[in-house]
């Protein structure tokens, strides 16, 4: 019987493609205040600043290239087509690496959405949004991003996917961002869990269940994928 594999990725995997993260010492929060660019209140107060911020991030994301970790996950899906990727990342590096079955928890930088219906999105052509552009429903388009403090629309689906995992691979996340970090709680008792992180993780609740691979994503993911494929 084919094993169900779930890959859960965070900012660290994209950082190895050159994209800035928020929480590192030299991260985005050193240059921008969360309250100014990534909350619903910020959007109401100064939408142009939010648009400019996400235009910058979109330009950077589209200039970045998928790395060996993204490509290894795509190879894993070639062998195990039912493999599901759940990502906290808003870039499209997984898709550009050839991945399918990608669930974005925090939105997608390449899309804009209606302000009346968070799930009603449109693709943006290029990297630049112009504030004031309208959705077909008449509302002003905003970045398709889950702002801090907003509900995560895909979280229930992510929990359902995690609950079906035989193998869960966690890469590029410190497991400090909730509710996404709680996904491990939904993994079945029999599931094998691998955490790929160059740093020693804080695994208070999962230490007895998690196999820690201490390596960067671009080294740890290809090595683990190769091992899983060899078992077939």
Language model segments and positions:
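Conserved catalytic core of sirtuin-type NAD+-dependent deacylases
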Residues: 1-232
């Amino acid at each position: 019987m084919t094993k169900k594999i779930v890959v859960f990725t965070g900012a660290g995997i994209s950082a190895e493609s050159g994209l800035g993260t928020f929480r590192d010492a030299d991260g985005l929060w050193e240059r921008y205040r969360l309250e100014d660019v990534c909350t619903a209140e910020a959007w109401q107060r100064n939408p142009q600043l939010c648009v400019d911020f996400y235009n910058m991030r979109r330009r950077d994301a589209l200039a970045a290239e998928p790395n060996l970790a993204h490509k290894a996950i795509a190879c894993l899906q070639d062998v195990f087509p039912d493999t599901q990727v759940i990502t906290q990342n808003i870039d499209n590096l997984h898709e550009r690496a050839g991945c399918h079955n990608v669930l974005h928890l925090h939105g997608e930088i390449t899309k804009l959405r209606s302000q009346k219906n968070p799930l009603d999105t449109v693709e943006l052509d290029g990297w630049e949004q112009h504030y004031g552009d309208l959705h077909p429903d008449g509302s002003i388009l905003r970045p398709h991003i889950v702002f801090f403090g907003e509900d995560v629309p895909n979280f229930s689906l992510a929990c359902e996917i995690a609950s079906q995992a035989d193998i869960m691979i966690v890469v590029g996340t410190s497991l400090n961002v909730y509710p996404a970090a709680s996904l491990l709680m939904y993994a079945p008792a029999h599931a094998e869990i691998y955490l790929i992180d160059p740093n020693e993780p804080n695994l208070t609740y999962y230490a007895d269940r998690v196999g820690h691979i201490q390596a960067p994503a671009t080294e740890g993911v290809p090595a683990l994928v190769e091992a899983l494929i060899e078992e077939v």
